[in-house]
């Protein structure tokens, strides 16, 4: 058997492993879209996990056509609202915000998050954007959307979470006109996603604070005579003599968890309206009852309960096709143990 060389477990691509700047995840890329202008993402709050019994509809699967048990994550997704339209221009240094067009009505919920300038004039902002569109200087159009946690009982917060959601489809002018038509209006997840569709989910993972190299990087415990130095949960070496400093690749203690992570190709199994049909006996642990619209995502989702989860169309879809699953049973057994 060959010698196993494993200086660490975990990718260095995620370095530096530090705390996320915000509990609201940010998307830096969106999948290609062809069609009429439409919003490209949604957000909800993680409730917890349960399991369902469904028919395995994957072709050539050993259990094709048979009932299988599938773990699912419940995400509560009340309607979101469009607060503003933001456009980007491009120069030598990258994309920059040109200006924003805000809705005429500034509701009480959003006023908890930010204050609109008293000197703001919507007509001037629209005129500036239209002139830039005619000059072909606009490279992207996004909507500033926000959640409404005040309608939920499981999330103890009233301040909405504000985020950018891309508008795609058609020309830049068509996207901008679509955004103007959505200002101040609500939209729900049913207008963006279909049951059986594959999605990408993004959230901030559970925070675990400062951890040592054994738990953080999976290095081996020091054994036999190496442990006689009264240090067992330490890395064996900090590096070579030269260069005369500790390199960043050396597995060391530090922050673990509370990082932004994206999981690809998570299948959306159900969009439900009645929370009672999914709430287990005694409610979900650390959350309670589901009262608003919800979705079932196959498998796990990053983060603890009550954490904001963003959903977008799958970027690495491959050959997956949209097939509405056949769910025969949803477990309502108590999660209290």
Curated annotation (Swiss-Prot):
Which terms does the record give in the GO molecular function aspect? rRNA binding; structural constituent of ribosome
GO CC annotations on file: cytosolic large ribosomal subunit
The cysteines covalently paired via disulfide bonds are none
Q: What SUPFAM superfamilies is this protein classified in?
A: Translation proteins
Question: One short Pfam family name for this protein?
Answer: Ribosomal_L3
From what superkingdom does this record's organism come? Archaea
InterPro entries found in the cross-reference section = L3_arc_euk, Ribosomal_L3_dom_3_arc_sf, Ribosomal_uL3, Ribosomal_uL3_arc, Ribosomal_uL3_CS, Transl_B-barrel_sf
Keywords, A to Z, come to: Ribonucleoprotein, Ribosomal protein, RNA-binding, rRNA-binding
Swiss-Prot/TrEMBL GO biological process terms: translation
Annotated NCBIfam families: L3_arch, PRK04231.1
Q: What family does the Swiss-Prot or TrEMBL record give for this protein?
A: Belongs to the universal ribosomal protein uL3 family.
Which function does this protein serve?
Answer: One of the primary rRNA binding proteins, it binds directly near the 3'-end of the 23S rRNA, where it nucleates assembly of the 50S subunit.
UniProt subunit comment: Part of the 50S ribosomal subunit. Forms a cluster with proteins L14 and L24e.
Q: What is the protein name given in its UniProt record?
A: Large ribosomal subunit protein uL3
Question: What is the species listed in this Swiss-Prot or TrEMBL entry?
Answer: Methanospirillum hungatei JF-1 (strain ATCC 27890 / DSM 864 / NBRC 100397 / JF-1)
